């Protein structure tokens, strides 16, 4: 996962301040996985979590990925001296604030959803919690 086109090739590191204001509530599915701490999540981690989710659900139900890795992270090659500019873009990450919903699922029962999202959470570098839509 990475953007098709970006305005700039390299980006500043930046910091993750505050809590998520947008993307903090369930928008599509019945169950979700919500971040409880700030961290950068890579495209590979998101993909690994998605695979764990879909495998456990046995292709039943529907999955929504609510984060997208749009920040390039640059890296210098191994054993290269400091200086000579910034390294080339190596991977793509998504900045995740606390309270952000990462994944949403629907079409499965509560127990299956909880198990699937727990498996997905194990693939991510952040603490998360299971959230459920309250019936109105």
From Swiss-Prot:
GO cellular component: cytosolic large ribosomal subunit
Molecular functions per Gene Ontology: rRNA binding; structural constituent of ribosome; tRNA binding
Name the record gives this protein: Large ribosomal subunit protein uL16
One GO biological process term: translation
PANTHER family the UniProt entry points to: 50S/60S RIBOSOMAL PROTEIN L16 (PTHR12220), LARGE RIBOSOMAL SUBUNIT PROTEIN UL16M (PTHR12220:SF13)
SUPFAM superfamilies, sorted: Ribosomal protein L16p/L10e
Family statement: Belongs to the universal ribosomal protein uL16 family.
Assembly description: Part of the 50S ribosomal subunit.
Gene3D superfamilies: Ribosomal protein L10e/L16
NCBIfam families: rplP_bact
Annotated InterPro entries: Ribosomal_uL16, Ribosomal_uL16_bact-type, Ribosomal_uL16_CS, Ribosomal_uL16_dom, Ribosomal_uL16_sf
């Amino acid at each position: 996962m990475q953007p098709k086109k970006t305005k700039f090739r390299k980006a500043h590191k930046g910091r993750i301040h505050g809590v998520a204001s947008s993307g903090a509530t369930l928008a599509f599915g019945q169950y979700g996985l919500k971040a409880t701490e700030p961290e950068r999540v890579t495209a590979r981690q998101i993909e690994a979590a998605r695979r764990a989710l879909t495998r456990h659900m046995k292709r039943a139900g529907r999955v929504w990925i609510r984060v997208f890795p749009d920040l390039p992270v640059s890296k210098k090659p191994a054993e290269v001296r400091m200086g000579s500019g910034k390294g080339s873009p190596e991977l793509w990450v998504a900045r995740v604030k606390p309270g952000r919903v990462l994944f949403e699922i629907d079409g499965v029962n509560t127990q299956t959803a909880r198990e699937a999202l727990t498996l997905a959470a194990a693939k991510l570098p952040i603490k998360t919690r299971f959230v459920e839509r309250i019936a109105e």
